[in-house]
Curated annotation (Swiss-Prot):
SUPFAM superfamilies in the cross-refs: Alkaline phosphatase-like
Record's GO cellular component terms: membrane; plasma membrane
A Pfam match: Sulfatase
Protein name from the UniProt record: Uncharacterized protein HI_1246
Source organism (scientific name): Haemophilus influenzae (strain ATCC 51907 / DSM 11121 / KW20 / Rd)
Single GO molecular function: transferase activity
CDD domains with a match to the protein in the record: LTA_synthase
Statement: the UniProt record of this protein carries the keyword Protein biosynthesis: no
Membrane association type: Multi-pass membrane protein
């Protein structure tokens, strides 16, 4: 009898690692292909197909070397251990699940932010209640699909890992150190992917003028981990744009302001100035109505969609800024600009940063010291985005949030409706006026936020279905009209300066390094004695708090570098932070764009076509852009953004 013995071929101890590297390379390449096909017009517009996939595979190898380099090393040394084999299976499975989960989450993130998941993805994870409520209300089917697919992937990966670790041949102990050294070298070179002074980073593989296409080169897992790693460097975040001596930085910033040196009153606080208000009567109340995501695209009188009949009418009664630009794309960036007049940086907004939780200048702090009641009125929960901590620590005496509303007319994912918010504001202001107390209040809306929930029957829908961005913007306008009907009949109307301003635009994105169109926002100052006018000067959100103080008759010392627009000045500049890219635009529409670890580039912005065209700009303009980009980080790091007074 002939007996045939068949034996399974024994695999290298590193076979499981190679298997999962190959699987993940395929998954990431297929995901990138799908995303590229989805965004094919934008990829083709920058002739990016070859670069996208060549550099994409390179970045995937980088990510996988980081992810599997350590287990590869430990497997080389301990593959004979049953305990290590179990740990290896878990590492391979959960590492791969993380990769595929991030890719599954990518289309929805791009749909909203026009970019692969980045630091915003991490920041939102801090607030699971709000985020999960939003997802459940507006994106339930996508959430269910993602969860089911991720669980299925986890099961499949676990089974594959079980198959991959079977029948591994043992490596002699003499050979193990040699192979381990080889693994270290290969993993290090693969992760670094460069023989230059710096290892690879997203800036090195950016090749186009379209920020989204550049982000497609990355994979979403790498993008998020890289963003998380950047958090620890926030104090010096702006240095990624270049370096400049502090004295030169302040010289350039001061020169751009055009103010005499005698206005600067402190050696310790370099931007601290004395400021005399234009209005010299009895100081007025100040109310900032900060509108969630209400960009110029939603305002008819600014050339946007016909969604704002109330703001359009109010614009005929007040001081409308036609050419004002937001400093960023997040609410906290808008808060930073409108309450502190602080320049943007690539770090998180100061609302979230540790060293700004007390002793950081805001106009609330200045006004509180001058006897004003200061408040923040919000329809959601005050802890979101760290707002309560920042406000309480920097001059805001009272905070009203969702728990303070008795029997609201409507409550959605992000809190009570804007009508409820404005009813609370009107009630609060009436009470304070009766008590004879001057007041400052920041009133922050939330109805114009995904999943776009607002009361029925309030507006004629612009489109179907009801829960759309455009309909929510129209409701936000309706609620503003509701507030001003009450305010004009109130006891506080004649004594108050109002500012309607957006925190940022909605769905900021586009086929350019910085989508300038989507930084254009409305700003409208109203109140008794405000002369109606349309102001075409190029201005920034950071010019609003200085202007409000002057209109209200509040003089004082403060470190804000924004212009007082009641005076005969022309700021002729706007600063825009788009993730880690910053733009400075001048009144002639010339733009300097600064990206991490790259030389500043000049462009011209064509408003009619909404495009950026490369252009040589003066070195002086590039230096001005760099000085302002570095300023915020320097002042924050050295705790120099203060009125110079002890509380």
């Amino acid at each position: 009898m002939l007996v045939v013995f068949t034996m399974k071929k024994a695999h290298s101890p590193l076979f499981p690692i190679f298997t999962f590297v190959l699987i993940n390379l395929i998954i990431l390449s297929l995901s990138r292909l799908g995303l590229a096909v989805w965004q094919s017009e934008r990829v083709s517009a920058v002739d990016g197909w070859l670069q996208l996939f060549l550099q994409g595979v390179r970045m995937d190898v980088v990510a996988l070397c980081y992810l599997f380099g350590v287990p590869a090393l430990l497997t080389t040394l301990f593959h004979s251990s049953k305990v290590w084999v179990k740990i290896l299976r878990l590492w391979l499975t959960f590492g791969s699940v993380f990769i595929i989960f991030m890719e599954i989450a990518t289309p929805a993130f791009i749909e909203t932010y026009d970019y692969r998941p980045n630091r915003l993805f991490i920041e939102y994870l801090i607030y699971p209640k709000e985020v999960f409520s939003m997802l459940a209300e507006g994106h339930l089917s996508a959430v269910i699909f993602s969860l089911v697919f991720t669980i299925l992937a986890a099961v499949i990966y676990w089974k594959i890992s079980g198959w991959a670790v079977k029948n591994l041949r043992s490596m002699s102990w003499k050979l193990r150190p040699v192979i381990a050294l080889l693994v270290i070298v290969v993993s290090f070179l693969g992760a670094r992917s460069s023989f230059q002074h710096r290892g690879i980073n997203p800036a090195m593989v950016a090749f186009s003028s379209d920020a989204l296409v550049n982000s497609l080169v990355l994979n979403s897992g790498y993008s998020v981990i890289y963003a998380a790693q950047q958090f620890k460097d926030e104090e010096k975040s702006s240095e990624m744009y270049g370096k400049m001596d502090a004295d030169e930085m302040f010289r350039i910033v001061k020169a751009s302001r055009g103010r005499p040196e005698s206005d600067y009153i402190s050696d310790k606080y370099p931007t601290l100035t004395k400021n005399v208000a234009t209005y010299q009567g009895k100081p007025k109340n100040i109310v900032i109505l900060l509108q969630e995501s209400l960009g110029a695209q939603f305002i008819g009188t600014l050339g946007g969609k016909p969604l704002s009949p109330n703001v359009d009418q109010l614009a005929k009664e007040g001081w409308l800024f036609e050419n004002l630009y937001a400093t960023g794309t997040r609410s906290v960036r808008g808060i930073e600009a409108t309450t502190a007049g602080f320049t943007p940086t690539p770090a998180r907004a100061v609302v979230k940063l540790n060293n700004a939780q007390s002793g950081f200048f805001t106009i609330a702090d200045l006004l509180h010291k001058q006897g004003y009641n200061t408040s923040f009125i919000y329809g959601g929960e005050k802890h979101f985005d760290n707002m309560a901590s920042f406000f309480y620590g920097n001059g805001f005496k009272d905070i009203w949030d969702q728990q303070d509303y008795q029997n609201p007319k409507f409550t959605g994912t992000w809190g009570v409706s804007d009508e409820d918010l404005f009813d609370k504001a009107n009630e609060t202001f009436t009470k304070l006026q009766n008590e004879g107390k001057p007041f400052f209040s920041l009133v922050f809306s939330s109805s114009n936020h995904d999943p776009f929930e607002y009361p029925d029957g309030k507006i004629e829908l612009y489109e179907q279905p009801k829960a759309t961005r455009n309909n929510a913007a129209k409701y936000a306008d309706y609620a503003l009209g509701h507030f001003f009907k009450m305010a004009k009949q109130s006891n506080y109307w004649k004594d108050t300066i109002f500012l309607i301003i957006a925190d940022h635009d909605s769905r900021v994105g586009g086929a350019s390094l910085v989508p300038i169109k989507h930084f254009h926002i409305p700003a409208l100052i109203l109140g008794d004695g405000i002369t109606p006018r349309r102001d075409s000067r190029l201005v920034s959100q950071i010019d609003m708090p200085t202007t409000l103080l002057s209109l209200a008759g509040v003089s004082g010392n403060y470190p804000m570098i924004g212009f007082d627009l009641t005076q005969d000045v022309n700021p002729d500049r706007a600063f825009m932070q788009y993730d880690q890219t910053q733009a400075m635009m001048k009144g002639n529409n010339d733009v300097v764009i600064q990206m991490p670890n790259k030389a500043a580039q000049g462009y011209h912005y064509d408003k009619s076509t909404e495009t950026l065209t490369p252009k040589d700009v003066p070195d002086a303009m590039k230096k001005e852009a760099l000085a302002h980009a570095l300023l915020g980080s320097y002042l924050y790091k050295n705790r120099l953004y203060s009125s110079g007074e002890n509380k």
